[in-house]
Amino acid sequence: AYISMVDKAGGVPMIIPPAGDMTSLLDSIDGLIVSGGPDISPATYNEEPGPMTEEFYPEQDFSEMGLIEGALEMDMPFLGICRGMQILSVAHGGKMHQHLDTTSGHEGHGGFFGKSTEHGVIVEGDSLLASIMGDSFTVNSLHHQGVSDSGSLEISARAEHDGLIEGVERKDKKFCVGVQWHPERKGHDSLFTALVK
């Protein structure tokens, strides 16, 4: 789905292997998407794994954080999707709710045992996300973890029903956006078009 969305937006998609020479990888691309995947190792945000924290791969976490740091140093357009938003937040000093269904006030976001749901999001009016997608819309929700603290990132969107962080961005970069939902499954073409522009 990511490949077709980038292609549809006018970009040339390229899948990056998990290991390799990061500098030459970044030199060969014009923008970076970090997408969904397994849980993030709690060690990256100085916590022990909770009982519901699923399989995680610290090497992937540190590799992705290195890619993100390198891409942003080059002011390369960046889009983090689901886990990609989470690892972007952790890379900026953020923290995670390890399991939303056991976090008071944040139950029911789906994502555990393959559950999926939908809810509204409210977007900050002065954000890049609002200029791309508007100030409120419906998103899919299939994540059992969530960002509890976005670190040095600006919060650009929250879930309408419980205030959970659903969007983050860096205003000092030309395009650095993270979203908790899966825009490629929701037909949110405008995000990919804005990334490729």
Locations of the language-model features?
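Hydrophobic, aromatic-enriched interface-forming segments
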Residues: M85-I87
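Active-site-proximal beta-strand elements of phosphoester/diester hydrolases
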Residues: C176-W181
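N-terminal beta1-alpha1 cap of cysteine-dependent amidohydrolase-like domains
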Residues: A1-L79, V90-A91, H97, D101-T138, ...
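Conserved G/P- and acidic residue-centered "switch" motifs that form tight phosphate/ATP-binding loops
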Residues: C82
